[in-house]
């Protein structure tokens, strides 16, 4: 990792803090797919998880360290509370990476000290440097975070930062854990650290923030102006509660407005050199991948990657854009990887054309996954005259980006109408290989299907969200269904796509149940509460 003071280090925590979004549970293969996409995107550091949280988290971090943390790849980071057990777990999980980092933390705000840790300032001032020094026995790259720094006493914050830097911390991260600060306050906090921590020049100042007041990105940009050189963010801004600072928004703000930010990094104002290492043309593909795998849809008006981000409905705006895009667009859609080159495939398109177009869209499938997706494509081509890139994305997502198929839907039939009681019959293959058939009635066809499935699966759950949207226009469009289930306080998402939304609804429900069932099978004996910064 390049630690030059004239550029911004991008630290991605999609796989750690982002996965703490309700319903965003990922399996090992999905985490690896996202990590590979983040490496292609060009992030400097990937926080791959919290190794002590569970055996599954440990294995995922270790696998990412081995397969993505190569000599030319990003630094792989693991989170650890300021305890020897956590730090040892992180150190062991990160061993395979060429470049690794342990990120350890402890709370410093008075409210956290009193009610969560039940420790004094003196206790924490002793623990933090001791644990940083212990982390240094595993790696030379150690990051320390004073949790809830935004509400901590500045003088105590200066003390603890000086102590951990003396103990060997190479990065000190300042989290606005509850999204409480405003840009002016957060900028002043970073400025105060720069001016009052005597050894601050020996460490990189990082920032981490939550979006509870919608100010995370603005806070980060103000922090950059005051000396922050690492930004901790997530794809699509996913994360606990209202989420984290969005990587794509930060990167494009620094890209589009670099002439404004250049002087704050000691550069000539007119320098065209990028302020980050991000390959912006990978942004859109990475956004879609994360959305697909987590089941967290991107709102249409989301900055940079939303469906409407480059759409113009006003006649005046449309006229201006047609004459010159700069009239109403401050950035080129192609700069984030969007393209107007929509190649239409049909039933006469062959396997090679299919593979080629998927590669152009950023999908690198194994032969087995390609075979499954191609068969699905040919089936769809018999129903639709033209298949667009959006259709292809839905096919790949539905066929290859699913949890382990513990329960498999073999058959679904429904009977309904305005003068009939909705009835559903389903056949499911269980994890033990048995085929079980059952039926149920409901308030509608989807309700009947879900009741019939529950009679077979018998895993208690609560359906808390059901949504369906058209992938493309037209009466023959693919319908994409996303659902969320709650079980014992945890949320599991599922998705599926089909030209028949009843079938898609059934498959989405099975997808979510498979995630839930897989989670129940995991050994959670060593699963501490999920950490939060």
From Swiss-Prot:
Superkingdom in the source lineage: Bacteria
EC identifiers of the protein: 2.3.3.13
Class of enzymatic activity (EC top level): transferase
Pathway membership, UniProt: Amino-acid biosynthesis; L-leucine biosynthesis; L-leucine from 3-methyl-2-oxobutanoate: step 1/4
Cofactor(s) recorded in Swiss-Prot or TrEMBL: Mn(2+)
Gene Ontology terms: biological process: L-leucine biosynthetic process
Pfam families according to UniProt: HCS_D2, HMGL-like, LeuA_dimer
Reaction(s) catalysed (UniProt annotation): 3-methyl-2-oxobutanoate + acetyl-CoA + H2O = (2S)-2-isopropylmalate + CoA + H(+)
Binding site for Mn(2+): 17, 208, 210, 244
Cell compartment(s), UniProt: Cytoplasm
SMART domains tied to this protein: LeuA_dimer
Pyruvate carboxyltransferase domain location: 8-269
GO MF term set: 2-isopropylmalate synthase activity; acetyl-CoA C-acetyltransferase activity; manganese ion binding
One GO cellular component term noted in the UniProt record for this chain: cytoplasm
Keywords for this protein: Amino-acid biosynthesis, Branched-chain amino acid biosynthesis, Cytoplasm, Leucine biosynthesis, Manganese, Metal-binding, Transferase
Segments of this protein annotated with the region Regulatory domain: 408-533
UniProt family annotation: Belongs to the alpha-IPM synthase/homocitrate synthase family. LeuA type 1 subfamily.
Physiological role: Catalyzes the condensation of the acetyl group of acetyl-CoA with 3-methyl-2-oxobutanoate (2-ketoisovalerate) to form 3-carboxy-3-hydroxy-4-methylpentanoate (2-isopropylmalate).
Subunit-level organization: Homodimer.
Stated name of the protein: 2-isopropylmalate synthase
Gene, per the UniProt record: leuA
